[in-house]
């Protein structure tokens, strides 16, 4: 089995996250890979976003493990669907913040609200962070700090437990670039784990960037071809 993060692992992280479309080379690579191996995209994004960026019939673990899309069917993990209304309220209560924080972008997802700080001035970020943390306390949701983003998400779920529930004890390759992927590495220490990019990690292996990761996946795909011959 193969479990792959999307942003930063298969595609570069860009300033406009709504434009993270897979290029032709990646589409071809993942299409070939999933024909030979049981392959999942594991991401903080929604199923709809990944389906738009990577228009392939592929299984997914989304919202950092809060839901999955398997064989075309959406499954909410650990009762996460009870938070759907909570995130509606959070978005309604905070969407006016774009007037208070120039450059802030707010994205409503079914099981998350994401605040993108990439275009904000550094002097305003601590104040915004305090506001978001207060909202998290009020609504009982989890705060995640990523690259240029702060996200409010379903508490008590993570990529690690979601991957483990899918794979059981089957051999697996798991790759990711961000802090959320560390939970996947820790909970699946019997897998072949790959950290993409710089930073300390629990992964067994490390590659420089998404370009190197694609090269590894191409090699794995070719091994799959040879095995079938």
Curated annotation (Swiss-Prot):
Listed SUPFAM superfamilies: HAD-like
Domain of life: Archaea
Pathway given in the UniProt record: Glycan biosynthesis; trehalose biosynthesis
Residues given in the record as Mg(2+) binding sites: 5, 7, 177
Needed co-factor(s): Mg(2+)
Classification via Pfam families: Trehalose_PPase (PF02358)
Gene Ontology MF annotations: magnesium ion binding; trehalose-phosphatase activity
Catalyzed chemical reaction(s): alpha,alpha-trehalose 6-phosphate + H2O = alpha,alpha-trehalose + phosphate
Keyword NAD tagged: no
Binding site for substrate: 5-7
EC number annotated for this UniProt entry: 3.1.3.12
Active site: 5
Induction (free text): By Tre6P.
GO biological process, one term: trehalose biosynthetic process
Family of this protein: Belongs to the trehalose phosphatase family.
NCBIfam families xrefs: HAD-SF-IIB, T6PP
Name this protein carries in UniProt: Trehalose-6-phosphate phosphatase-related protein
């Amino acid at each position: 089995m193969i479990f792959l993060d999307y942003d930063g692992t298969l595609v570069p992280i860009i300033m406009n996250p709504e434009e993270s479309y897979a290029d032709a080379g990646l589409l071809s690579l993942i299409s070939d890979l999933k024909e030979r191996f049981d392959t999942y995209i594991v991401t903080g994004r929604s199923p709809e976003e990944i389906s738009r960026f990577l228009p392939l019939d592929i299984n997914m673990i989304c919202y950092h493990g809060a839901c999955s899309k398997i064989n075309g069917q959406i499954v909410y993990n650990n009762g996460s669907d009870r938070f759907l209304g909570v995130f509606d309220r959070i978005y309604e209560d905070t969407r006016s913040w774009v007037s208070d924080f120039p450059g802030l972008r707010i994205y409503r997802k079914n099981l998350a609200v994401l605040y993108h700080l990439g275009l904000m001035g550094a002097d305003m970020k601590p104040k915004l962070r305090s506001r978001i943390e207060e909202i998290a306390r009020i609504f009982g949701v989890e705060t995640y700090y990523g690259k240029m983003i702060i996200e409010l998400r379903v508490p008590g779920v993570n990529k690690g437990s979601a991957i483990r529930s899918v794979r059981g004890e089957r051999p697996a390759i798991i790759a990711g670039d961000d802090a959320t992927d560390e939970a996947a590495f820790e909970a699946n220490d019997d897998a072949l784990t790959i950290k993409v990019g710089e930073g300390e990690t629990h992964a067994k292996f490390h590659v420089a960037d998404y370009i190197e990761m694609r090269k590894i996946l191409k090699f794995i795909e070719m091994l799959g071809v040879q095995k079938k011959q």
